[in-house]
Amino acid sequence: MLFNEHQKKAISYISGPCLILAGAGSGKTRVIINKIVHLIKICHFDPKCITAITFTNKAACEMKSRILNVLSVNVSNLVKISTFHALGLEIIKSEIELLNIKSNFTIFDEQDQISILQEIVSKEDRSFVRQIRQSISNWKNKLLCPNQVNKISNSSIEFKFFRYYELYNAYLKSSNILDFDDLIFLPTILLRDNKLSRERWNDKIKYLLVDEYQDTNFIQYKLIKLLSSKRSNFTLVGDDDQSIYSWRGANIHNFESLKHDYPNLRTIIMQHNYRSSGRILKVANALISNNLHFFNKKLFSNLDYGSIVEIISAKNEEDEARVILQTLMLHKSNYNAQYKDYAILYRSNYQVKIFEKFLIKFKIPYKILANISFFSRPEIKDLIAYLRLIINPDDNAAFLRVVNRPLRGIGAVTLQKLKEWSKKRNQSFFMASLDIGLESILPVHNLKSLQEFVYLIQTISYQIQLNPIEVLEKLVATIKYEKWLMRSLKFSKLYVASIKNISIVLNWIINELKYKIMNSKKFVMKYLIDIISEFILQNSLNEDIVINNDYVQLMTLHASKGLEFLYVFIVGVEEGVLPYYRNTTMENNIDEERRLAYVGITRAQKKLFLSYAIQRCQYGVVINTKPSRFLRELPQSDILWQKSKILNLNEKNNFLFKAYKKSLKKKLLR
């Protein structure tokens, strides 16, 4: 296997802290895989003492698959490849007694957080609740507990938010629930404050690799330091020019902190790009050179210099969508390309609607990569909430989610009285439903409905420990969920899709459980807890982009990171869109918008098109726009400015007919 000099250095250096500054398309995943192989085969590291951290489950699965191609199954399975949250969950389970958490805890996602904060805040609008959730998340990611926030609160609104943080934390504790932030917050606090735990995990992880270092936030960097505090044996791989997630807490200054905290840091810069033409890289380098840099880096390629970069000016967003798609069809016809070779990238999701209209009109097959997770679908959230409640009866959020799904005639007044009673008795909603005193405040039929639901959950919880697979296979029928969906959705496409989705998840859970209980049924509930936690963490059995099918692919610039396409269109390259209007006042924000444009440009392999509209409708008002400042920063000798051409009806029909005829001829020749 051939490597360039910088890749060789990156793979072989293990004598202390190492930063691999990996430019776009420089083969970073290949380097990480081969560094793991080098650690095992050449340096004789025990595979189970090597941990690699990625940011997504998809990236972790890809890395596992590629390691499997190089190492034997037995060896590759010992290497831990994980996300930060999955590793945090493992630490929590391992150190659960020190953390004073009950073993049947469940995990909250963002939607659950919003629902509970809505209860706590009471009568406040949803956008305000989202602000509170974000503040709590920010505090946890800065390692701040409620009492610490109280000390630094400088305004009445901060103090108010601190109180919500306090109440929210108390709710989590009483319900035996962790949110996503806790999965990193709790292990980091523990490793910081408990020397024995810190040493134990330093001995478990003797070499640490972290991918996408530019996406780390304050607490993740702190966790990296704690996990490697004994030996400083780590390799961090990232690119400061691709740091585009500050809105999610990513801190580009972690590069600066790294240089300061580790004076003996070895920095290896990989600049050789194996993806894009020389001209595309020249354009990308020129753009990003306008940012301040922690490191000097300039991408180069040994591939052809390539065709000119085209900038298309359109009258408005409709004209932009039309001309881009006509250009795409003509280009496809001229170069015998496939639709899957093309990507249309945009800054914000609202931009895609007009493109969808013309894609349908021109009969172009397409796929929009949306950031909607499989887990967020109502039927999946219901199923997981049932399982959470079966595992953990203290989970009040799960109780509220499913107590009336299917409908059981348990109204808002009944639930409010139950909440008040449970608070008075210091019990979960589940246990309060069984309290003998509840009959004094609830009508008989309401109490009966409530207790029948609780008895149903208790029965399933008991039976699942005896015959787990059979109980799970019959779960949807037992809770009468399918009948309820049938009545609600009346055999519509949505009903069919919902039943199919439930079946996918249940089959996945059943298969995982079958594998775990092959040797013993003794720990069924523990296994189920692990499986549900894993599913919630994955949060993405959603459809990924389908590379093998012949679709034009549309996605945001953020979603395009890590992907590559032969031909790329970046649309809406104008002031207020890219850069985004909210990010045009502060230099740091402009730098990130520029990095976002850079990420889009470096997705292209052979040909790049950029477009902007002279007028755009925003919030119902047509406004005049200006081409993005980023276009002026590109090397003008390498770009061609084009005006959109409005075809008359005959030209349009002739154009579409020629493209269709050529496409049909190609299909017949296959």
From Swiss-Prot:
Protein name per its UniProtKB record: ATP-dependent DNA helicase Rep
Pfam families: UvrD-helicase, UvrD_C
Enzymatic reactions: Couples ATP hydrolysis with the unwinding of duplex DNA by translocating in the 3'-5' direction; ATP + H2O = ADP + phosphate + H(+)
Ranges of residues in domain UvrD-like helicase ATP-binding: 1-277
Annotated EC: 5.6.2.4
A GO BP annotation: recombinational repair
SUPFAM superfamilies: P-loop containing nucleoside triphosphate hydrolases
Residue numbers binding ATP: 22-29, 275
GO molecular function: 3'-5' DNA helicase activity; ATP binding; ATP hydrolysis activity; single-stranded DNA binding
Record bears the keyword Protein biosynthesis: no
Quaternary organization: Homodimer.
Alphabetical UniProt keywords: ATP-binding, DNA replication, DNA-binding, Helicase, Hydrolase, Isomerase, Nucleotide-binding
Keyword Nucleotide-binding annotated: yes
Domain UvrD-like helicase C-terminal per the UniProt entry, residue ranges: 278-562
Species per Swiss-Prot/TrEMBL record: Buchnera aphidicola subsp. Baizongia pistaciae (strain Bp)
A GO-annotated cellular component: cytosol
Function in brief: Rep helicase is a single-stranded DNA-dependent ATPase involved in DNA replication; it can initiate unwinding at a nick in the DNA. It binds to the single-stranded DNA and acts in a progressive fashion along the DNA in the 3' to 5' direction.
Family per record: Belongs to the helicase family. UvrD subfamily.
